[in-house]
């Protein structure tokens, strides 16, 4: 069964897609996609999904969505550009979340755009790191959203 949070990301990505070379326009579009995704997931079950969950106040970092029922964090990097840096940063957010709480997160689903993200994330180093984290009971996976053809 497909993950409804990932499905919502694909839908938000497809609906709001714009082709522009303007950096400001692309930033606004990415923000609109992320907001649409968070709203759609919240509508699925507002008691289950915590939106923009604070890791710790002193770090001023948030996890996009926390599935409180399954102990799963979701992060959506709309543009695949710079996805590797965001990927590692998001893993650190989950590790710190788990250090600061009794109720731990057991998984992270990192969602990003396929064209730019896959070449860097479907690679030996990220795969080795995900394998290592699984040995520490943190399951990390990468899901890709794509332009519908």
Where are the regions a protein language model picked out?
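Arginine/glycine-rich "motif VI" loop of SF2 helicases in the C-terminal RecA-like domain
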Residues: 96-104, 135-138
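Soluble or luminal CAZymes and related metallo-dependent hydrolases
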Residues: 29, 33, 86, 125
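Domain-level recognition of nuclease-like catalytic cores that cleave nucleotide substrates
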Residues: 3, 109-149
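Active-site-adjacent loop/helix micro-motif of nuclease/hydrolase catalytic cores
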Residues: 75-91, 119-122
């Amino acid at each position: 069964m497909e993950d409804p949070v990932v499905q919502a990301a694909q839908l938000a990505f497809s609906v709001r897609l714009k082709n522009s070379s303007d950096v400001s326009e692309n930033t606004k579009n990415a923000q609109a996609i992320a907001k649409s995704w968070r709203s759609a997931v919240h509508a699925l079950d507002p008691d289950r999904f915590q939106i923009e969950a604070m890791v710790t106040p002193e770090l001023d970092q948030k996890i996009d969505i926390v599935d409180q029922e399954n102990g799963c964090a979701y992060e959506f990097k709309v543009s695949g550009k710079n996805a590797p840096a965001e990927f590692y940063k998001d893993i650190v957010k989950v590790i710190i979340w788990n250090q600061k709480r009794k109720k731990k997160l057991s998984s992270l689903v990192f969602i990003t755009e396929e064209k730019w993200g896959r070449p860097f994330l479907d690679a030996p180093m990220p795969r080795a790191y995900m394998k290592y984290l699984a040995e520490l009971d943190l399951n990390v996976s990468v899901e890709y959203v794509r332009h519908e053809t």
